Design a protein with these regions (language model features):
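Histidine-centered catalytic micro-motifs
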Residues: 148-154
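Short coil/turn motifs at secondary-structure junctions
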Residues: 157-159
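Aromatic/His-enriched, Gly/Pro-containing loop or helix-boundary segments
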Residues: 102-132
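Surface-exposed, glycine-biased beta-strand/turn segments
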Residues: 17-87, 97-99, 124-126, 131-132, ...
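Sec-dependent N-terminal signal peptides
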Residues: 2-13
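Beta-strand/loop nucleic-acid-binding surfaces
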Residues: 91-104
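Alpha-helical and His/Cys-centered functional microenvironments
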Residues: 9, 18, 155
Length: 222
């Protein structure tokens, strides 16, 4: 019963948190990448928002919080921004073109102090606070990005585990296409598992068949 109470409480906390987030843009949400997609060497840890094919779209803080981390690099997220929020989550904004002026000034100071363009900065809660809806950056195509978009994540601040951002925006995203299974790869654990008597991987493809109506044969009256 105790575990049930915890599960119910967690559900309501998630629901309340989801209701508190605003979308990072002021235009309709369209996705170019989903949470958990298989990439070259990892699973996609966030969602990718389309930015109407261009850079420089204002990005708003999804709720109150503070800038907890800033990364500037020619790889990965490129210009990346991390905002930590009172509800125990951290939101991540990647591939940014540039930062809001107050954030950009702080970065420039640190780059001169460290004598390096590439920086990975961690901030205290009182250094750069932000308000929900405040413009914190502008969308871009920096780092390991193949086109203008915003990479967006929601993480548990304490554990840094990634959460599915779709749960926070599902009321604003139109999805009319059902998932289609392309195949299933079964991988036996070495020395412990087999598939059809073999320890080799087995790829299963979906079986497709035409549907026919089952009923009375032609000419048979019922």
């Amino acid at each position: 019963m105790y575990k049930l109470y915890i599960a119910i409480l967690f559900f309501f906390i998630q629901t309340i948190s989801a209701q508190q987030l605003r979308q990072p843009f002021d235009f309709p949400i369209l996705l170019s990448g989903n949470f958990g997609e298989l990439r070259n060497n990892h699973f996609h840890s966030g969602i990718d928002f389309k930015t109407q094919g261009v850079e420089g779209k204002p990005i708003h803080a999804v709720q109150d919080g503070y800038v907890s981390r800033i990364s500037v690099s020619p790889w990965g997220y490129g210009n990346g921004l991390y905002l930590t929020h009172p509800d125990g989550t951290t939101t991540v904004y990647g591939h940014l073109q540039r930062f809001a002026p107050s954030i950009a000034r702080y970065i420039k100071t640190q780059q001169y102090e460290q004598e390096s363009f590439n920086v990975n900065l961690f901030l205290d809660p009182d250094q750069l606070p932000v308000k929900k809806g405040e413009i914190v950056a502008y969308s871009g195509n920096t780092g390991s990005s193949g086109g203008p978009h915003l990479h967006f994540e929601v993480r548990d601040t304490e554990s840094e585990e990634v959460l599915d951002p779709i749960e926070y925006f599902k009321e604003k995203i139109t999805d009319t296409r059902a998932p289609k299974i392309q195949g299933i790869l079964v991988c036996p654990q070495p020395g412990k598992g087999v598939v059809n008597g073999s320890s080799r991987k087995l790829e299963l493809k979906p079986v497709t068949a035409k549907m026919r109506q089952i009923g009375a044969s032609p000419g048979h009256e019922t």
